[in-house]
Each structure stands twice: as C-alpha cells, then as structure tokens.
Amino acid sequence: MKLIDADPIGINVCSTVATYANVHDELRKVYAKLPDAKKAGYKAGDFSYNTGKLRCPTCDGTGVISLDVQFLPDVEIPCPDCHGSRYNGDAGHIKRKTKSGELYSLPELMDMDVQQVLQACEDMKKIGSRLQILQDLGLGYLTLGEAGGRIIAKAIPEKIACDRGSITGKYLR
C-alpha cells in the first residue's frame, strides 16, 4: 500500500513537473548530444537547474527572485534575466529539430505544457510514455518547467500518474 498525500511534489526549489516526471534528465541527454551543444562543449549536466553551466546565474536556476519586504512575507517575482526559464541566454541557442521540422530549445520546451511537449517530442518514446500518463489523467495543461513546490492541489493526480507509470520508481509519501 502506498500513501499519496497533498504535499507539494517538489523536493527542492529547483523541482519541476519535468524533474518529478523524470523527463528532464532524458531531455538534457538529448540536448547534450546535439551538434551545437557538442561544439560548445556542453554535457547533459550543463543543462541542469541545480549546477549546470547553462543555469541562470542571477536566480541560481530557480526562475524567481525573492524580494525582502519588511514586515511582510517575502515576495517572489520572475527573474529579470531569464524571465522564469531558469536558464541563461546560451541555452536558447541549442535547438533540436522536431519530427515536424520545428526547432525548440530546452528552455522553450520547459515553457510548454505537457500536451504541447507530447507533440514536439513525438519521436522520443521514453519521454512520450511518461508524459502520456500525465495527459491521460487530465494534467496536460501543466507546463514542464512549472515549479513543483507550487503544485499542491494538482499534486495528487500527478503522484498517482507517476506511481502508475513508475515514472520516478520511488515510493510516494
């Protein structure tokens, strides 16, 4: 028996729908193999929010800046440099051609919802199967880059989806 509660899905501030669904690692590997990434010397780890060379240095890959408002709770605003994408400008230059001929960078994919990414990554079976579970449970509207800590009420069906499809391979809390 597994307990599925309403806690946010995010383990840390860099957790997203893509990391929780375990597709971010796959996407990073795909983008690291592209000719432009190889030419620039990027590896899969460089596309990480946590430590990668391509993460935004201003917000440290969180996509937000916290403003200290005296006597009130801190206010989070989108990062003025990456505009919430979590990546620096160089990441936008590494683009992958889809089956339909469109070009997308990893930051652009992370800004898309599950339904859009399913179409853009239709030639990637592993990613498609993991995202299809979310889509089937009515979560196609979630963006891949949506912060995991902000998804609370939506987390229950996402946890079920991830458990059902063994997306994370871990027991849920």
Features from the language model and the residues they span:
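Conserved phosphate-binding elements of NTP-dependent enzyme cores
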Residues: 1-173
